[in-house]
Amino acid sequence: MKISISANAPPWKRQEFAEQLTYVQEAERMGADTVWTLEGWGQDAVTPLAYLAARTHKIKLGTAIMQVTARAPAMTAMTAMTLSALSEGRFILGL
């Protein structure tokens, strides 16, 4: 059975990003398959995944919602390609 988790810390609370990292690393250690972030006013979905990609090894990283109206299609594609490279192919683009 595959298990997915959500990791969304408010962008204004640095301490909660550290707590989310611990949460995701522990979930990865326990065999979770994927971590998802979403986008809303005040926080993008990609930056937290880049942070997590640098500090995890196996867990897949996905955007549950990436606002296509907030960025140009070319920027969405470039962002996805960059995060896929940074995460060694673990990134899943969800629109």
Regions found by a protein language model. Name each.
Residues 45-49, 68, 78:
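Alpha-helical scaffolding within the catalytic cores
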Residues 1-62:
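N-terminal beta1-alpha1-beta2 module of alpha/beta enzyme domains
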Residues 1-14, 72-95:
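Flexible, glycine-rich active-site loops centered on histidine and acidic residues
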Residues 60-66, 92-93:
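A short, GP-enriched loop/loop-strand-helix hinge that lies immediately N-terminal to
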